[in-house]
Amino acid sequence: MKDLRLLLFLAILFLVNPSSLFAQEIMKTGPTFHGIRDFREVMPGALYRGGANNGHAPLNHGELSALCEDDIGTAIYLYTTGFSGPSITHCSKGDLHYIDKSWEGSGRATVHKQVYDSIKSKGKPVFIHCWYGIHATGAVAATALMQFCNVSPKQAVDYWKVGVPAKLQYPKVIQSIMSFKPNPALQLTPEERDRYCPRFNAN
């Protein structure tokens, strides 16, 4: 009887405030995925993130193949170190395009446009990464949430801090997020936000 009451309470809690449960998921670190560290869903079906886990280097062939088999359409390396140029990985799910773009300025804007185009065309998701999957990757993911999901600067910074040790929470990166201004030309419809945006607690 006690177990039944507990289940009933949990069911009511979920029905009354499901967004709070979804909000907990976005604020967690991710697992290792075929060698890719801290693999996380940012915007379901549209944007994913992680770290290369290869030192100061881009993704290796095995990691690219795993992303391709997971039906990711584009992988973006947010640095230039060790990058030998754009490539295409073929797999049973199709093709994965691998490119590099900066995590700041026009590079970040290009990443946001790539995500926007993928959503509008109902294409495959985008995966972004840096070396460890926290600083640059987190900043681009945080500003994407501001761009597409109406997330506040404070919420975005709180999201970026997940998995980042306090001593490595660099003011430069935080300021980059706080000062970001969404591009009005890349706005999603309310229906698209409902489909692709995670839930955050009010903040």
Language-model regions: role of each:
Residues L8-P18:
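Bacterial N-terminal signal peptides
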